[in-house]
Every structure is written in structure tokens, then in C-alpha cells.
């Protein structure tokens, strides 16, 4: 360790912008702390899906909101400002939230979204906070998958019940209703039907905590379809606080089979109970007759029931909605959530749409039990708050966008592209060039306002890929938000107009996979050839190619899938739901070798890997060569190496086949031999891999995204280490490297786009560097940007992104921490040797300590980021400690 000494690092500007050479990976560092000072930054866009909400009676400005896969946010000023309070936890999907009525500091969070669809994340149990969300502790139930409701005894906060649906990808014992009487130290499964049935809803009598109702739901979902309903589903009641339960049958209730159930007990009159019950609407299923109806009501505490409404608007797509809430001061006033937002004022007999809706795709609602005018609704657009019983709403969008893919162009500064759930394809800047005024100051970067993002055609679930030669042309796709299978457009940024160029225009709404001409998946691939930017590939069950801008398409493959017709049937169970999402037997990934034209890889969502070496004339199935690969996985990503024509990497996702282990492989001989490369990725409920990417500078340096994080390998996948740093634990669906700026861009499915600025420390981190006492990494090129006019925008926006700091970034490595009086000094000189600037770095302050006054750069410890307005430079052992750098750089 350096003690009482000043480390002096000399830099000449003539070397400042030297290009980093290609280097080969060597012995990896064993401690991620080495590069922990490299920080990600969020850039946008506005987010969407929320799934849980609660307020606190008597505290009108306090709300907690749970995102579908973006963690928990809290506001204490009625929704003006929001703070993420769950990012330190290894899970981001929130299924339920509850605050103890006897102690508002006690908050419980059940993880795992329970609104079932193909692209949702699972949880890792239940968490508790004793300080109003400042800190959290995992309290068990790790394998329950999805906890859709948590109920706390109003008088005894240590008594908690959890409604566990299960992961729903196969049978499991960790389903049903669980209860703790000791604050989560131990749990008892108090209601269990079978391993195919879980809890869909749970309700407590507001006046008697011993009386409980539970909806149990038999459901299973796979890549190829969803089955809702069965003998396990039903409505249950307990009169002893959940210790024992009785199935409620007959007495006016629908006969089985039934599916998802939601239940609520009125506060003003606890004899009034409402149950939303999924039926088959009279359509036979598996040869069995089904009943019709939507809403049942009991006026005697659940003893007898009557069907009061059969309007499908109440529950819409049952697996995705089926929720209700009763006004605390009127047992006849009930709210229902689906794509619409409806209300009854006469006990369920008639429905009325609200004069102003909270949004679309509504999922959950909280009404203040002491004030029926105060309410909050979470939906696919964020959270909406009303203080006048729903006559008007304040709509809030949080930084929780669910992004499917990310691509980048090569402009200066570059733009980022991708598709957002419940939105179109988007384009936004990595740097909005607004350094001052709007949310920022001086040379510190400023914010990226939501208004600088705009749609580029496409839809929620696909790709947005710029032409590498003409970045004004963007190929956008997405079957979501529409009924056309394989929907694709060619967007021109110059006039912001798009032209539809899909392979085959076909309305697939309501059609099973076996009925359509081309089986385009919800997120079918678009790949532009690295050898010819006019050649664009897409995948159905075939690989299609265009060379004339989408005017015509040719098939260059046979059906590359298993084509198992038994797994191409109607999806949904009691309520059919066919919109192209659960289409199996589709090409899910396409990659052409950057090294050798005509070498094209294709992966399917029924578990096959195929290769052609002659541009599609002949194909070889190399799946059998992959060791220990189960069947029916989704080949989610193929990365063809830029270094060797025969080398490729794949990730295979099995989570919808009830296997959440990570699967990643490498081949170096065109698929003849494969090697598993997952050592170091921990096995958990959230281990499954989505994407693998090769570094364009350093051979053997790889990046891999899983359902709850990012990993890096310095040795070609032999070992993996976390690269999480400041990144929330949202699913990392896609990865891109911007080569000019050496930036790593991520598409997170729950927290939007994130960028790790400047990968050069990782690209240059070798065993020799780690053995040295100190090392200065060759900096990347810096640009002197001029600020642009600021758009009209509110000063504070929780969904606004963050610009990179202004100026050059200097990264250095220290083997040991500096002592209290030690300093590291960076001396910058010009080509003649004249010193133009010196920057002194002090030891990093303890976490939570206030920064010392003085100039410096806006970076973390051990890294230098530009501008004379920078904060003090700090350094500690490891890579990425930052010091302020000069504004020298190339004009742009």
C-alpha cells in the first residue's frame, strides 16, 4: 500500500488519444472490486408497467409502487418526486406491497409478477422493511415464484399471509397460501391444493382478521402455450386466521372447471363479498361443458352466491387482469381493472366507464380505507393517483421501461434504439448535449429529457436496427400492439415516415400457430448483414432475406424448427388468447459471421441450432453436438465471432420449460464441438441467460446478461464475474457495444437503457496491469461538444436520463488503497513536455461521507472525468477511479 507518498502519473497529450491495440484475454481478476468504480448511467426512455401499489392512511403524500420488473419506488410528496428503494436487492419483479396498519414503518414486498404472460419476470421470495423502505431483508419463500398478494394482520404486524402462485412453468410444491406468526422467521403452508395450482388472490375481512378468502388458480405456461383452469381452481374460506380452509362449492357458484379468481370483502358491510371468476363462457374445453359469467356476489359472508354480471369488460384477458377493489364507504361501489377501467355503483349489476380513466391495461388499485376519494391505480403506463374519487388523475411515468433489444448507430454522439413494451420502437441520444440548466450544471452533463426520444415505427416487442451505412434508415419490427404477424417497417429519420415491408401481411389475431402461413414470433429477429448493408434477414419458421429495401423477400432456408404441430395449437385454456406471443416452432435468433460472408447461424424457440456456410443453399442442424442441452429451449441469442469465422457463442433460455439454470455455449469449428461456458454464474430463480456479446477490441472479453444482472468474462467464458456496479438488478435482455466510443449499451427489461461509458479499462485490464502498483489506462478519444438548445420540459422528471460528463475520462489502477495522507497525482503535458494541468487525487471518502469542497470531476473514485467544474478527485484500490481531466479533445 502506498503510504505518505504521492503517486505521479505523467501524460502527454500526444499520447492522450492513442488507439488501444487489440489484446488477447489473460488471467482474469478474481475480485469484481477491481473494476467496481466503473459506473453505469441511465439514459431513458419513460417507463411503463407497474403491478403493485399501496399508500398509508393518514399520510396523504406517501405511496409505494412496485414495478413489473423494475423494483420499488417511493414518493413522500404525493407523486412529484420518486426514489428507487429496492435496487440493492437481487430481484426486480414486484408482485405485491403491504404496509402494516399498526406500524407504518413495516413494509412487506412479495416478489414476482402474478399477471401471467410470456414476458414477465419471476421473484425470489418475500422481503420486509422495518424502516419504511430504507433497508430490506429477505424473509424466505424463495421458490414461490410469484407472490400476488400480501396481507398483514391489522393488530399484529408479525402475522403475515402470502398468496403464492408459483412460477407457473410446471408443477411445484411451493404454491398456495403461506402464513408466518413470527414476522417471517418461519412460514407454514396453510392452504395447498396440488402442485399445479397456486394462489391468485387473498382477501381479509376488514373487521375480522380471522375471516379470509382465497382464490386458487390452476395455470401453466410454456413457450408454446398457456393453460388456464382445471379442477384445482376454486374459492376457499378460512374462519380461523388461515389455519384451516374450506372449499366453497355450489350455493350459486359456477361449476368447475374454472380458472383465475379474484376476491374482495367490503369494509362497510363485511357480509358483502365479490368474486371475479374465470369461466369458459359456455365454450366446451377438453370435451367438458363450461359455464358463463364473470362476477359473483355474496351477501351473507360467502355462504350463498349469485351471478350479477357477465360482461367480459370486467376482466378482459383473464390471465393478465382479474382484479377488483371495493370502496371503503360503499359496498355497492366496486372498481374493475382490465384494458379498460370500469365501476359499478349498484353492487355489480351494471357497469359504467369512469369519466377519466387512470390508463390502459390496469392491474391493481389501492383505496385509502379512511378516505374513499383517495386512490391509486397501477397499469402498463405507470401509476395514476386521484384525490377526487377518480374524476381526475395525475399520471406518473417512472424510469422502468421494459426494453427488448438495443442497437446503436455510429453518429457523434451516437443514438440508441430499441423496442419498449407497450410502446413503439424508440430512438434517443446517448448524449443530448445539454450541459447546463435542465437538471444539470456547468460541465457536469445535465439530463436527457423525455422529449428528445421519438418513435421510429415498429412496435413493442421487436427490434429497431439502424442501417450501418445510412443511419437515417431504421428497420423496425414488432408483432405487439397489433394483429399483423411479422409486422415490420422501414423508417426514414429524414422525413420521419415509415413504409411497411413485412414478408407476408397476415392478420394473426385469434389464430394459433398451426393456422398461419409464416410463424413469426412476438419478437422475431432482424439482422443486417455485416458484409452488405442492403441485405437484411428476418425469421419466421424460415430465414427470409431482402436486398431491395423490403420490396421483395426470398426464403433461404427450409423450416428450421421441430415443427411439432401438437405445440402449435390454441393457447389460453378456458379463455383462448392468441396474439402471436406463444408461437412455438419459430426462428428466434439469426447471426451472420462478420469474418466470413455466407456463414449464417439460426436458433429456434424450440431448441434447435442450425448453420449454413453457403448463404442458405444448405443447412446443418448442429444441436446434437451441444452437450447437456435439454430440449425445447429458446435460443435467445447467437453471437458470431468477429475474430474467427468458425467461432460463435449462444445463450439458451429454458425458464418457460421449468429450468432456470444458465445455458451458454461456445463453438470454434462451425458447430461441430461445443463447450459450456457458465462457470461463475450462480444458480438461482433468476439465473437464466438472455444475451452474450463479444468485445470488439479484446478477444476473449465477453459480456452476458441474465434475468437479474450482467456478467463479464476475461477468458473467453471460462470464468464469469458480476459487472453490476450501479446497475439495478433488472433483466438484461440485450447488449450492444458502441465501437467508436467504447461504450457498453444495455437493454434492461424493467429499467430502460443503461450505458457503461468507456470500456477501455476492461479492454486493457491484464495480468500485468493487476500485478503493477499503479497503471494509467490509455484513454479513449474525447470530444469537445457544443451544447444545443434545450427543449421545453419540466425541471424534474423521474424518467429523464443522464448525460455523460463533459470532457476526457482518465482511468487508472491502484493495487492498494491510498493512506489518509497519500495522494495520486496526474500530470498532463503537451507534446513538447510543457505541463498544462495537474490533478491530485485524495483517498476515497467512506461511503455516505459528504464530499469535500473544491474543484474536480463528477466521477467516482479512481476515475477522472472532465471539466474545471469537476468535484474533488478521489481514488481507492482497483480500476476506474476517476480524476478530473482537461477539456482538451477533438472538436465536433
Please provide the spans of the model-predicted regions.
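Beta-propeller blade termini and top-face loops
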Residues: 25-798, 805-806, 841, 851, ...
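Contiguous beta-strand segments within globular domains
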Residues: 785-825, 829
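N-terminal compositionally biased, intrinsically disordered segments and leader/signal-like regions
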Residues: 14, 182, 668, 880-883
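Glycine-centered tight-turn motifs at strand-turn-strand junctions
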Residues: 631, 685, 835-892
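Extended low-complexity, serine/threonine- and proline-enriched intrinsically disordered segments
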Residues: 298, 546, 823-845
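Bacterial N-terminal signal peptides
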Residues: 6-20
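Positively charged n-region of N-terminal signal peptides that target proteins for export
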Residues: 1-4
Amino acid at each position: 500500500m502506498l503510504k505518505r507518498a504521492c503517486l505521479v502519473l505523467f501524460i502527454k497529450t500526444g499520447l492522450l488519444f492513442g488507439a488501444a491495440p487489440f489484446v488477447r484475454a489473460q488471467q482474469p481478476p478474481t475480485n469484481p472490486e477491481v473494476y467496481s468504480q466503473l459506473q453505469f448511467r441511465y439514459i431513458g426512455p419513460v417507463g411503463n408497467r407497474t403491478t403493485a401499489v399501496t399508500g398509508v392512511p393518514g399520510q396523504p403524500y406517501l405511496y409505494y409502487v412496485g414495478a413489473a420488473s423494475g423494483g420499488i419506488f417511493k414518493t413522500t410528496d404525493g407523486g412529484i418526486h420518486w426514489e428507487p428503494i429496492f435496487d440493492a436487492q437481487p430481484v426486480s419483479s414486484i408482485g405485491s406491497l403491504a404496509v402494516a396498519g399498526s406500524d407504518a414503518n413495516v413494509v412487506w414486498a412479495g416478489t414476482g409478477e402474478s399477471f401471467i404472460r410470456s414476458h414477465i419476470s419471476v421473484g425470489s421470495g418475500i422481503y420486509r422493511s422495518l424502516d419504511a423502505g430504507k433497508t430490506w431483508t429477505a424473509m424466505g419463500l424463495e421458490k414461490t415464484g410469484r407472490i400476488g398478494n400480501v396481507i398483514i394482520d391489522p393488530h399484529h404486524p408479525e402475522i403475515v399471509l402470502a398468496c403464492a402462485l408459483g412460477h407457473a412453468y410446471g408443477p411445484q410444491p411451493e404454491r398456495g397460501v403461506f402464513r408466518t406468526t413470527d414476522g417471517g422467521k418461519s412460514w407454514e403452508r396453510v392452504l395447498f391444493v396440488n402442485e399445479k395450482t397456486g394462489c391468485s388472490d387473498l382477501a381479509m375481512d376488514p373487521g375480522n382478521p380471522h375471516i379470509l378468502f382465497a382464490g386458487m388458480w390452476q395455470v401453466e405456461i410454456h413457450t408454446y402455450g398457456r393453460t388456464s383452469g382445471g379442477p384445482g381452481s376454486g374459492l376457499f374460506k378460512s374462519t380461523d386466521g388461515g389455519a384451516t380452509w374450506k372449499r366453497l362449492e355450489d350455493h350459486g357458484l359456477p361449476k368447475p372447471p374454472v380458472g383465475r379468481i379474484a376476491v374482495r370483502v367490503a369494509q362497510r358491510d363485511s357480509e358483502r363479498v365479490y368474486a371475479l371468476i374465470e369461466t369458459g363462457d359456455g365454450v366446451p374445453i377438453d370435451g367438458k361443458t363450461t359455464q358463463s359469467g364473470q362476477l359473483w356476489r355474496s351477501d351473507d359472508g360467502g355462504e350463498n352466491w349469485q351471478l350479477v354480471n357477465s360482461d367480459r369488460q370486467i376482466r378482459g384477458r383473464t390471465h393478465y387482469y382479474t382484479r377488483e377493489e371495493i370502496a371503503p364507504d360503499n359496498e355497492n361501489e366496486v372498481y374493475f381493472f382490465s384494458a379498460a377501467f370500469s365501476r359499478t355503483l349498484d353492487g355489480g349489476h351494471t357497469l359504467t366507464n369512469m369519466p377519466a380513466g387512470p390508463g390502459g391495461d390496469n392491474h391493481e388499485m389501492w383505496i385509502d380505507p379512511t378516505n374513499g376519494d383517495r386512490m391509486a391505480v397501477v397499469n402498463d403506463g405507470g401509476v395514476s393517483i386521484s384525490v377526487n374519487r377518480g374524476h381526475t388523475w395525475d399520471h406518473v411515468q417512472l424510469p422502468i421501461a421494459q426494453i427488448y433489444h438495443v442497437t446503436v448507430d455510429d453518429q457523434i454522439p451516437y443514438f440508441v434504439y430499441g423496442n419498449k413494451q407497450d410502446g413503439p420502437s424508440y430512438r434517443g441520444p446517448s448524449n443530448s448535449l445539454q450541459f447546463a440548466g435542465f437538471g444539470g450544471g456547468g460541465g457536469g452533463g445535465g439530463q436527457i429529457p423525455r422529449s428528445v426520444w421519438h418513435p421510429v415505427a415498429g412496435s413493442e416487442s421487436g427490434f429497431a436496427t439502424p442501417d450501418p451505412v445510412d443511419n437515417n434508415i431504421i428497420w423496425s419490427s414488432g408483432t405487439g400492439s397489433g394483429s399483423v404477424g411479422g409486422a415490420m417497417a422501414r423508417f426514414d429519420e429524414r422525413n420521419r415516415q415509415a413504409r411497411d415491408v413485412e414478408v407476408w401481411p397476415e392478420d394473426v389475431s385469434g389464430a394459433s400457430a398451426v393456422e398461419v402461413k409464416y410463424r413469426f414470433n412476438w419478437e422475431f429477429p432482424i439482422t443486417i448483414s455485416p458484409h452488405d448493408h442492403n441485405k437484411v434477414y428476418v425469421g419466421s419458421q424460415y430465414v427470409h432475406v431482402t436486398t431491395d429495401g423490403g420490396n421483395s423477400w426470398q426464403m433461404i432456408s427450409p423450416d428450421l424448427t421441430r415443427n411439432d404441430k401438437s405445440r402449435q395449437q390454441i393457447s389460453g385454456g378456458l379463455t383462448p388468447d392468441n396474439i402471436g406471443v406463444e408461437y412455438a416452432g419459430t426462428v428466434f435468433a439469426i447471426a451472420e459471421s462478420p469474418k466470413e460472408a455466407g456463414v449464417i447461424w439460426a436458433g429456434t424457440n424450440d431448441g434447435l441450432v442450425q448453420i449454413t456456410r453457403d448463404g442458405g443453399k444448405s443447412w446443418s442442424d448442429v444441436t446434437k453436438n451441444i452437450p447437456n442441452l435439454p430440449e425445447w429451449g429458446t435460443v435467445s441469442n447467437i453471437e458470431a465471432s468477429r475474430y474467427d469465422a468458425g467461432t460463435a457463442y449462444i445463450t439458451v433460455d429454458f425458464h418457460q420449460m421449468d429450468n432456470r439454470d444458465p445455458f451458454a455455449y461456445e463453438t470454434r469449428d462451425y458447430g461441430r464441438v461445443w463447450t459450456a461456458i457458465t462457470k461463475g454464474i450462480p444458480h438461482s430463480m433468476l439465473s437464466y441467460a438472455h444475451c452474450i456479446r463479444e468485445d470488439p477490441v479484446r478477444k476473449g472479453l465477453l459480456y452476458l446478461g441474465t434475468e437479474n444482472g450482467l456478467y463479464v468474462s476475461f477468458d473467453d467464458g471460462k470464468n464469469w464475474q458480476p459487472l453490476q456496479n450501479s446497475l439495478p438488478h433488472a433483466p438484461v435482455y440485450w447488449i450492444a457495444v458502441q465501437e467508436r466510443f467504447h461504450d457498453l449499451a444495455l437493454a434492461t427489461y424493467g429499467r430502460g437503457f443503461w450505458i457503461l461509458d468507456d470500456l477501455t479499462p476492461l479492454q486493457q485490464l491484464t495480468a500485468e496491469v493487476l500485478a503493477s502498483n499503479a497503471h494509467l489506462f490509455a484513454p479513449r478519444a474525447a470530444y469537445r461538444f457544443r451544447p444545443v438548445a434545450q427543449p421545453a420540459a419540466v425541471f424534474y422528471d423521474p424518467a429523464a436520463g443522464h448525460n455523460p460528463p463533459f470532457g476526457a475520462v482518465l482511468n487508472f489502477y491502484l493495487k492498494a488503497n491510498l493512506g489518509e495522507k497519500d495522494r495520486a497525482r496526474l500530470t498532463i503535458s503537451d507534446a513538447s513536455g510543457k505541463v498544462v494541468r495537474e490533478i491530485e487525487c485524495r483517498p476515497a471518502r467512506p461511503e455516505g461521507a459528504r464530499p469535500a469542497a473544491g474543484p474536480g470531476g463528477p466521477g467516482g473514485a479512481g476515475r477522472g472525468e472532465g471539466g474545471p467544474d469537476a468535484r474533488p478527485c478521489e481514488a481507492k484500490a482497483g480500476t476506474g477511479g476517476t480524476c478530473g481531466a482537461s477539456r482538451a479533445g477533438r472538436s465536433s
